[in-house]
């Protein structure tokens, strides 16, 4: 299924148009407890939403699990959903990931529309057809590839976000800059995240989405170049799963932290320029701080990396860079090199 991404200037009319192309007998909206309060009132003011059934699940990524998935299935079932129904996922990455999976599996699949409300969801989670939940203490363990019919990006929702959630989404934009062009990367590492210019950010969101769209179009099921989007995620997912048992961190923070050791490995193994690595790392440390790991945590982190779905034949798989936009997929590193990269993360 082809996904259409709309950068919205008039949410109501664009939603009406999208719904007219998603013929449906019943309409459902999935929210979490946060977006129900902050974002749903916008949709409820639209005439096209007057008969929509609202399903609400608990907020935060710790609830992106099978219990919440069952709540959504139950809400669809009790609301009388059929194979011809449609669900709108209104929320951040947790909602678009889990809602997409629920819609893709209920009655073998119903149409769904993503309206992302966080920066992270706008530039990453809602685009590209990955639908997924966490399982067994592991991040993004169970899911399917299935495109939403539409993704409608309304950057007005960014005004509902706190600084931490802006930073979280921005990490994926920084990754997109690293795998794209020098000009894009330079703008991203020069941006003041402490006092973000929302107008500038809105334009940058459009640029960032285009990077992901271009890559996904070439490789929808992650057999090759789409692995570029995994930059920062091999260490990042391990950091995120490690933190889940202690003090959970937002996904974008985990990705930002993951970029540090992965750029270090890129310098050591694929010739990424040291100065550009330093500039990127300094930006991350300035706006994201650090994660309080010790060398005693290395074995647990490496074990978590061994569960990464990108791995082949039990070997931990990385995406590295030879330069800005010079993508090297399917790279490996020894355990000693991984530990050196973790040393750099802690001390560099």
Show the residue positions of the predicted features.
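ATP/NTP phosphate-donor binding region
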Residues: 1-86
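Non-catalytic interfacial helical region
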Residues: 76-90, 97-114
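Generic secondary-structure signature for well-ordered alpha-helical cores
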Residues: 78-81, 147-150, 156-163, 171-183, ...
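Short glycine/serine/threonine-rich phosphate/pyrophosphate-binding segments
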Residues: 94-100, 122, 238
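A glycine/threonine-rich phosphate-anchoring loop and its flanking beta-alpha core
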Residues: 101-193
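C-terminal charged capping/lid subdomain of soluble metabolic enzymes
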Residues: 173, 274-348
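Active-site segments that bind and position negatively charged phosphate/pyrophosphate groups
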Residues: 190-299
């Amino acid at each position: 299924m082809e996904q259409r991404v709309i950068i919205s200037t008039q949410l109501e009319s664009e939603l009406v148009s999208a719904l007219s192309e998603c013929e449906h007998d019943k309409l459902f909206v999935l929210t979490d407890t946060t977006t129900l309060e902050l974002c749903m009132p916008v949709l409820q003011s639209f005439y096209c939403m007057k008969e929509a059934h609202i399903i609400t699940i608990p907020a935060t990524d710790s609830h992106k699990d099978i219990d919440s998935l069952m709540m959504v299935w139950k809400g669809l079932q009790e609301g009388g959903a059929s194979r011809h129904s449609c669900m709108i996922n209104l929320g951040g990455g947790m909602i678009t990931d889990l809602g997409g999976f629920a819609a893709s599996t209920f009655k073998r699949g119903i149409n769904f529309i993503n309206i992302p409300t966080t920066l992270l969801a706008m530039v990453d989670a809602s685009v590209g057809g990955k639908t997924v939940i966490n399982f067994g203490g592991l991040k993004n363990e169970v899911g399917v590839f299935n495109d939403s019919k539409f993704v409608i990006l309304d950057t007005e929702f960014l005004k509902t976000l706190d600084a931490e959630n802006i930073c979280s989404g921005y990490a994926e934009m920084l990754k997109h800059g690293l795998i794209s062009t020098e000009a894009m990367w330079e703008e991203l590492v020069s941006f003041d995240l402490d006092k973000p210019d929302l107008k500038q950010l809105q334009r940058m969101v459009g640029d960032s989405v285009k990077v992901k769209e271009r890559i996904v179009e070439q490789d929808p099921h992650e057999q090759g170049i789409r692995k570029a989007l995994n930059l920062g995620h091999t260490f990042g997912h391990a950091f995120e799963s490690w933190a889940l048992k202690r003090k959970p961190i937002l996904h974008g923070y985990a990705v930002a932290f993951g970029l540090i050791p992965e750029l270090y490995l890129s310098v050591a193994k694929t010739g990424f320029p040291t100065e550009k690595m330093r500039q990127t790392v300094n930006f991350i440390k300035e706006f994201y701080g650090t994660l309080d790991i010790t060398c005693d945590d290395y074995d647990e982190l490496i074990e978590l990396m061994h569960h990464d779905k990108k791995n082949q034949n039990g070997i931990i798989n990385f995406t590295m860079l030879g330069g800005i936009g010079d993508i090297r997929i399917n790279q490996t590193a020894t355990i000693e090199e991984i530990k050196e990269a973790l040393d750099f993360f802690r001390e560099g």
